[in-house]
Amino acid sequence: VIGAIPALLALVIRARMKEPERWQKMKDSGALDRHSVFTYGELFRDPRWRRNAIVGMLLVCSGVIGLWGIGFFTPELIRTVLSKTYAAQGMTKEQIGPLVDKWASWGLLTLQVGAFFGMLSASWVAARLGRRKAFAIAFSTALIATACAFQFYTNASQTFWLIPIMGFFQLAVFAVYAIYLPELFPTHLRSTGTSFCYNVGRFLAAAGVPVIGMLKTEVFAHHPEPMRPAALVMCCVFLLGLIVLPFAPETKDKPLPEDERSFAH
């Protein structure tokens, strides 16, 4: 029942949401019918939108791999570390199991609490300093915070500060995606371009999960806690975002891009 509340809220918002004025004008003029407006072919035909789509997709890959390939393994880190801690204290497996599960759940919760405040802060930074600077700060701090969390987590109390700090910086970049990606494309390609960046980026990012699995079970199998070095290596994915960033156009205080052909009729 609780899970249905966001869906009901989405229905209310959708019913009250209006189409963008520019898009509505294009629809009323019939311009939409004269273009392949909802195809990837149209998106990649123009070098401007093609470049923006590739840049946006790579930026998304960096953040999503960081989250899926590292951040969402936080419960495993907590279970591994605390299981050893409690075993050293003389607890039985029957006692340890429920206890580490509880702390793993707290880890996911505090990660999301940190994410909430991180996204709010990143939105403010993007509005004040610009999108590229917001991305640079987000990727850099995500790398540092994630590496620190997976290297220095040693006790349950850190679940309430080290993990939310990681969530704050790791998911902050997703707020910048929401602002930046729609600003890269003209009206008739905005949804197509944004969905390409998100969905293709997420599809490619799915490779991060088996990669960290391989690092744990093969490359660092000899390590007493293979999750730690595996996560440290995976943190390099945030460098991808920083490498791509010089090719990303700054959109702060600039009008939304438009393809003049769309309004030529």
Please place each PLM-identified region on the residue numbering:
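Interfacial helix-cap and linker-helix signal at transmembrane-aqueous boundaries
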Residues: 78-79, 125-126, 212-221
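Cytoplasmic membrane-interface "Motif A"-like loop-to-helix N-cap segments
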Residues: 127-139
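Multi-pass alpha-helical transporter architecture, strongest
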Residues: 10-16, 180, 235-262
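Flexible cytoplasmic inter-helical loops of multi-pass small-molecule transporters
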Residues: 15-39, 254-263
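C-terminal ends and interior cores of transmembrane alpha-helices
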Residues: 140-154
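Extracytoplasmic gate region of multi-pass secondary transporters
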Residues: 47-116, 205-209
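Hydrophobic core of transmembrane alpha-helices in multi-pass small-molecule transporters
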Residues: 158-172
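A membrane-interface helix-boundary motif in multi-pass transporters
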Residues: 1-2, 216-236
